Each structure stands twice: as structure tokens, then as C-alpha cells.
């Protein structure tokens, strides 16, 4: 067992608090104080926690329980008197005039009922008196305080140890959700807004992808990414990171704009801050509990990490009467979600082969409940990750879930029995026996982390996944031909390659075993499938190209290629000409705005493979066509311009907005850059809006876009 785990496990292994003697308790409190201080520094200063929130809460609860049993033993340096950790070196120090305290925790519904009951008793409320309490998701990010004087942002700081934080003003100025100047009238002379700096799941994934492409380390989770980004000594690095901010409370305020918590949040919105749209107010404790469970169910769909729900008494005069206890306010409570980590046994490691030939190791686990969900599989990503974790079949491991993210192994519990052998990553594909290779990334010159099968469509696993992709919604979109049907038809030999789909009806007519006679099928369902297939013999060229499953070619790139080359025949002809990389055709491909070297190499390699060309020939013989896209308008005000959409649109779907923009001759991009001409910002726009402002790009709201688009 490693030293870092040993100290934690020893602290938890002590006897029950009820059985601790007066002689034993001081030693246990000393050990817990040291352990909690160590993990505070790892979390708040180094952004590198080694234990889960649940494990940390267990340490604190044990410390508090011992202090409650023996109040005369409470130490001056007790963790119950402390919030966070002292600021690290590297930034100037900022003293919080109003301490940034943490919240007391609730771990079940009964704790919430007790919280409401304690408040009622303290305030001497009658049974019929309404106790309004606000509720909002507890964001898993980094706390920050923003000071405004005469409406202008003058200083920002991290929480630090609650009394003294780090001056990160310049870094906070780069976050789009943080206004440089407050909007509206009657703004107090001094305003200190507090909230959470965080990173969305989408932005986190994109950041890690950029890190990988640049050969840099990836971040473990969005919180670490947000914390590491905010605490950069170079504000330019922070500016390049997609950070966001939710406002949820205040510190020093020369004059309050309302007499309720919810009223102050309304003022924050008017001043230009983003308040969580799920913020609400409840008049009964059961409504609070319903709110919590509703958020818990929606957690995976929010797009950012949360670890619970925060409750606050709404009336500020009642907050003042309730006051504080130790390190937390008596009028607020954090209702934490169940632990999202658990220990289990890794029974074996299996290799799955994806559509692009990627060999992905999957951990098969002894089933365990993690955050209310039974988990039996977890991703191990690639060979490098297996090596980094040092994981072997038979190990006891810690498994983590985060929202809708695939469960993953975060560490090995190092009490491995002797004789456990290392897992050897295969150098051949387990499905077809072809060589599995790690390609050289042309940008970094380093080997890719992912090994890929070289078998292409010869590989059964790739073939099935590519067929599923071919019929998917954004490709050929064949109704009635879903994942299960593709897998079954492939196994029975009915569909092995894309053109087999379009000859299925003709072959079925000659077959002794008709589709209608197969289990789960009938005459009507078979006829509907054949009709659906016939209806998709002609699709837009971008759908056709996307359906081919060329590595790195997504919907946007497929549309770019369709616009640039016009017809499938011309596209294929030019890609084959580009094979030697010296032909003008290769230079022309690279000249397309949005096509880089990696994408160009992938496209040319696809057409260089004989079996891929045979697929295209087969589709032509089956009468399948890629229809050229309609000509774009050239006289519209957005023709030739690059447009980016962000936030939630209310009067049209994102797909409708993109389609209209392209119809008007605009190029729709997925990210903001110096080449962007227009950003259309819907509700809850985030980092893209901030970057557009920074670059001086024209910004339109939804109504302005509709007026422009006509």
C-alpha cells in the first residue's frame, strides 16, 4: 500500500467515535487535522485532489463527531474552524473583508428536514408560517470574488483559505460571463459578487483534444481544468481557455439592492451576470427535496459538473438573525449527491474495435453501484492510460462517474496479490488479425495514444460500426435500419458493405428465406424497410460524404467538401490525383478554409485504399447518388461570411439556423476565430461570446439574426 493511501486509510480505520476514550480522542483529532490539512492543500493550492469528495467529507464528519463528543478537546487549528487552504505563492494576496465560508452538508432527505426544523425553531416560526428557501445547483468549480467600485470591475480573487485568497484579477477579466462594467442604474458604490468559475463538458472535451494535438498533458476533469486555467501566471493562457462564471452570492456590499436572496439574484442578472437558470424558490421542505431529486435526475444533461444542491433562507433579515456557526452560515445548506466513486475488482480487460479502427481497452468490473447507477464496465482509453494507472486484471480499483461521462478507473488500490501479470496491449486486431499500429501525429511528431487496426472494411468490427454510421441520422438516415438491424443483417450475411443495403430487396425477392418470414419481421415491416431504402438512393452530397466514415470528416467538413467539389465523381477524381501529395489537387484540398494537414491526409488515404474505392463503385452500380448541394445565394448580406451560433435559440432549432445560413451563402463554423464574421448569440451564451467580444466580432441576438436572414 502506498504512503499516500496509507495515511488516509489509517485515519478511517480507527474505532467508532462512540467507543473512543478521552485518552484516545486527542491523538485521533491530531491525525485527522493533519490529514484534512494535507488534502486541503492538494485540492485548493495544487488542483490535484487524491481522494474523492465523499472520502473527504467522511474525514470531516468524523472530526466533527469527535469534537461534539469531547468539546473540551477542540483544537485551535481544528478543521472545523478552517475553510480551504492558504493561498499558494505566485499571486498577490487579497484579504476578504467578508470571509468566504463553506457550507454545512446534508447527505440525505432527513438532513434537509432537520435543517428546516432547526431554522423554524431558531426563528420561533409557527407551523402555518411559510419558510421560503432558495435552491440552486451546486457548481463543481473554483470559487471567486469580484469587486466592483462605481460599477467597474477593479479586483478579483480566489477563495484561498476563506480569509485570504489570490489576486487573479487579470485572469478573471478574460472570462466573458464577468462584465467589465455593471449595467443599469442605482448600482451600489461597492459591490462584491461571488460565484463559481467552471468549464462545460463540451468545452472541456475540446480543450483536452487541443492539448492532445499539441502533445500536452490532458486535464483529469473540468474542475481541475478550470482551476488550472484560472491560476495561470500568464493571463493570455487563461484567455485561451473556455471558462465560465455563475454568480450566486455576495461579500461586501455598500447597499443591498433587495431584501431577499432571490431579489439580489434578480439584480445580478440585470447588472450583467449569469445566474444559474435553474435557480428557484421553494416554500416547503418537501418542495426542496423534490427540487433536489429533479436536479439529480437532470444532472447528466446539464452540460457542466455539479455535486449537489444549495439551499438558502430567502429573507435577508432572517439570514441576519440566524447568523453563523463555526465555518458556515446557519441559514444555508449544501445537499450533496451520493458518492460518484466506489471500489470494485477489475475482472479482465477486453479490447473493442471502433468504426475508425481504434482499439479501445474496456475494463470489465465486478458490478458496483456508483452514484446510484450500477457500473460493470469502464473505459481505459488506451495503452498509455493502462500504463499510467499501473492497472492489472484482478486489481481492486476506484471507479468514478461524472454526469453522463462513461465510467472510468481513477486509481488502483495498492494491495495487489503477488503474481498478477501486467496487461500486454495487443499489436494485432482481435477481430480480424490485421496489424494494429500507432500513427505519428503530423502536428507533434509523436505517436498517437490510440492504436488502430489497419484492416479497414475487411475488419468485421469496423464494418459493422461503419455500416451503422452509414445509415445514421446525419448520413443516409434510413428509417427502420438501426443499430440492431445492421448487426443482425451483418451476422446473417445479408449486409456486409454499404451497397448491400440497396440490393437487399432484389436479393430478398430471389431468396428462399424471405425477410418477412424472419423473427421480428412481417410483410408490412419488410415492405416499409425496402421503401425507406429506395427513398434514400439519392441524398445530398454532404450526407453521402459524411456517410463514408472518413476519419476526421464530420458534418461540417463534409459540407465544405461537397461545396468545394460539387459532385462525387469530381471529388473522388481529385482525391485520387492528390495521392502523391505533389499534384496541384493536394494543394487545392489544403487551400479549402477549414481543411488542415491532418484532415487532408485522412481523406487522401481513404481514396488510396482499393477496398474503399470498391465501396464507391458498388454504390454507383446500385444506383446510389450524391446530389449536388443547391447553389448558395450570393446577394444576401451574409454571403461569403463565416457565422457561428452559440447559446440556446428559441424561435428555431440550431439545425434550422445553420441550414438557413448556408442557404444564404454563409459558411457555418463551430468555433470562434479571427476568421469569424458574425456570432449569433442565444440565451446562456458562454465562452464563444466572450471570445467574440475580445476579437471585436459582430454579435447578433436571435431576433437580429432572423431580421438579417429574412
From Swiss-Prot:
One of its GO terms (cellular component) is cytosol. GO terms for biological process: DNA repair; DNA replication. It is an enzyme of class 6 (ligase). Its cofactor is Mg(2+); Mn(2+). InterPro entries: BRCT_dom, BRCT_dom_sf, DisA/LigA_HHH, DNA_ligase, DNA_ligase_AS, DNA_ligase_CS, DNAligase_adenylation, DNAligase_N. Zn(2+) binds at residues 429, 432, 453, 459. The active site is at 138 (n6-amp-lysine intermediate). Pfam families: BRCT (PF00533), DNA_ligase_aden (PF01653), DNA_ligase_OB (PF03120), DNA_ligase_ZBD (PF03119), HHH_2 (PF12826). Residues 633-710 form the BRCT domain. Keywords: DNA damage, DNA repair, DNA replication, Ligase, Magnesium, Manganese, Metal-binding, NAD, Zinc. It catalyses: NAD(+) + (deoxyribonucleotide)n-3'-hydroxyl + 5'-phospho-(deoxyribonucleotide)m = (deoxyribonucleotide)n+m + AMP + beta-nicotinamide D-nucleotide. It comes from the Bacteria. NAD(+) binds at residues 53-57, 102-103, 136, 159, 196, 312, 336. PROSITE patterns: BRCT, DNA_LIGASE_N1, DNA_LIGASE_N2. DNA ligase that catalyzes the formation of phosphodiester linkages between 5'-phosphoryl and 3'-hydroxyl groups in double-stranded DNA using NAD as a coenzyme and as the energy source for the reaction. It is essential for DNA replication and repair of damaged DNA. HAMAP family: DNA_ligase_A. Belongs to the NAD-dependent DNA ligase family. LigA subfamily. This is DNA ligase. It comes from Parvibaculum lavamentivorans (strain DS-1 / DSM 13023 / NCIMB 13966). The lineage of its organism: Bacteria, Pseudomonadati, Pseudomonadota, Alphaproteobacteria, Hyphomicrobiales.
Amino acid at each position: 500500500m502506498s504512503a499516500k493511501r496509507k495515511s488516509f486509510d489509517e485515519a478511517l480505520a480507527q474505532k467508532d467515535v462512540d467507543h473512543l476514550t478521552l485518552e484516545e480522542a486527542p491523538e485521533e483529532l491530531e491525525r485527522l487535522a493533519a490529514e484534512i490539512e494535507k488534502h486541503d492543500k492538494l485540492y485548493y493550492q495544487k488542483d490535484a485532489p487524491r481522494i474523492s469528495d465523499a472520502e473527504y467529507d467522511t474525514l470531516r464528519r468524523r472530526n466533527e463527531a469527535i469534537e461534539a463528543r469531547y468539546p473540551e478537546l477542540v483544537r485551535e487549528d481544528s478543521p472545523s474552524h478552517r475553510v480551504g487552504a492558504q493561498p499558494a505563492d505566485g499571486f498577490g494576496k487579497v484579504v476578504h473583508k467578508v470571509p468566504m465560508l463553506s457550507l454545512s452538508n446534508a447527505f440525505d432527505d432527513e438532513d434537509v428536514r432537520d435543517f428546516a426544523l432547526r431554522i423554524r425553531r431558531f426563528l420561533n416560526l409557527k407551523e402555518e408560517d411559510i419558510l421560503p428557501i432558495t435552491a440552486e445547483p451546486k457548481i463543481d468549480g473554483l470559487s471567486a470574488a469580484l469587486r466592483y467600485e462605481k460599477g467597474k470591475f477593479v479586483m478579483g480573487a480566489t477563495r484561498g483559505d476563506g480569509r485570504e485568497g489570490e489576486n487573479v484579477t487579470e485572469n478573471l477579466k478574460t472570462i466573458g460571463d464577468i462584465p467589465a462594467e455593471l449595467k443599469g442604474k442605482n448600482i451600489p458604490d461597492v459591490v462584491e459578487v461571488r460565484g463559481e468559475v467552471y468549464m462545460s463538458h463540451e468545452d472541456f472535451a475540446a480543450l483536452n483534444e487541443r492539448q492532445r494535438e499539441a502533445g500536452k498533458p490532458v486535464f483529469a476533469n473540468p474542475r481541475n481544468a478550470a482551476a488550472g486555467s484560472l491560476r495561470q501566471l500568464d493571463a493570455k493562457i487563461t484567455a485561451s481557455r473556455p471558462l465560465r462564471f455563475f454568480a450566486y452570492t455576495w461579500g461586501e456590499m455598500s447597499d443591498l439592492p433587495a431584501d431577499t436572496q432571490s431579489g439580489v439574484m434578480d439584480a445580478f442578472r440585470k447588472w450583467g451576470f449569469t445566474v444559474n437558470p435553474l435557480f428557484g424558490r421553494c416554500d416547503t421542505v418537501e418542495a426542496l427535496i423534490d427540487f433536489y431529486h429533479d436536479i439529480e435526475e437532470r444532472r447528466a444533461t446539464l452540460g457542466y459538473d455539479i455535486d449537489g444542491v444549495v439551499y438558502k433562507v430567502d429573507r435577508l433579515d432572517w439570514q441576519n438573525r440566524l447568523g453563523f456557526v463555526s465555518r458556515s452560515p446557519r441559514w444555508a445548506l449544501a445537499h450533496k449527491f451520493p458518492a460518484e466513486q466506489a471500489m470494485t475488482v477489475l475482472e479482465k480487460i477486453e479490447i473493442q474495435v471502433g468504426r475508425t479502427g481504434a482499439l479501445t481497452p474496456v475494463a470489465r468490473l465486478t458490478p458496483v453501484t456508483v452514484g446510484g447507477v450500477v457500473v460493470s464496465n469502464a473505459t481505459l482509453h488506451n495503452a498509455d492510460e493502462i500504463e499510467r494507472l499501473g492497472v492489472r486484471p484482478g486489481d481492486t480499483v476506484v471507479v468514478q462517474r461524472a454526469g453522463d461521462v462513461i465510467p472510468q478507473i481513477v486509481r488502483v488500490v495498492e494491495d495487489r496479490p503477488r503474481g498478477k501479470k501486467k496487461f500486454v496491449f495487443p499489436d494485432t486486431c482481435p477481430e480480424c488479425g490485421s496489424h494494429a499500429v500507432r500513427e505519428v501525429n503530423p502536428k507533434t511528431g509523436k505517436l498517437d495514444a490510440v492504436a488502430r487496426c489497419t484492416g479497414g472494411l475487411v475488419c468485421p468490427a469496423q464494418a459493422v460500426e461503419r455500416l451503422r454510421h452509414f445509415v445514421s441520422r446525419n448520413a443516409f438516415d434510413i428509417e427502420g435500419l438501426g443499430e440492431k438491424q445492421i448487426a443482425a443483417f451483418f451476422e446473417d450475411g445479408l449486409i456486409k458493405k454499404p451497397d448491400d443495403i440497396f440490393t437487399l430487396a432484389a436479393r430478398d425477392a430471389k431468396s428462399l428465406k424471405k425477410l418477412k418470414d424472419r423473427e421480428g419481421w412481417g410483410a408490412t415491416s419488410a415492405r416499409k424497410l425496402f421503401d425507406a431504402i429506395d427513398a434514400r438512393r439519392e441524398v445530398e452530397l454532404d450526407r453521402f460524404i459524411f456517410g463514408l466514415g472518413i476519419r476526421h470528416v464530420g458534418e461540417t467538413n463534409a459540407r465544405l467538401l461537397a461545396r468545394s467539389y460539387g459532385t462525387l465523381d469530381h471529388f473522388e477524381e481529385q482525391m485520387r490525383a492528390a495521392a502523391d501529395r505533389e499534384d496541384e489537387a493536394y494543394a487545392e484540398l489544403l487551400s479549402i478554409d477549414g481543411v488542415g494537414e491532418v484532415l487532408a491526409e485522412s481523406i487522401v488515404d481513404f481514396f488510396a485504399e482499393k477496398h474503399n474505392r470498391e465501396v464507391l463503385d458498388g454504390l454507383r452500380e446500385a444506383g446510389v447518388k450524391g446530389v449536388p448541394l443547391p447553389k448558395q445565394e450570393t446577394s444576401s448580406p451574409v454571403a461569403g461570411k463565416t457565422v457561428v451560433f452559440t447559446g440556446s435559440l428559441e424561435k428555431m432549432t440550431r439545425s434550422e439556423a445553420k441550414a438557413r445560413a448556408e442557404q444564404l451563402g454563409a459558411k457555418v463554423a463551430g468555433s470562434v476565430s479571427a476568421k469569424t464574421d458574425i456570432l449569433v448569440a442565444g440565451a446562456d451564451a458562454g465562452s464563444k461570446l466572450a471570445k467574440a467580444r475580445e476579437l471585436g466580432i459582430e454579435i447578433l441576438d436571435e431576433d437580429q439574426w432572423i431580421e438579417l436572414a429574412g
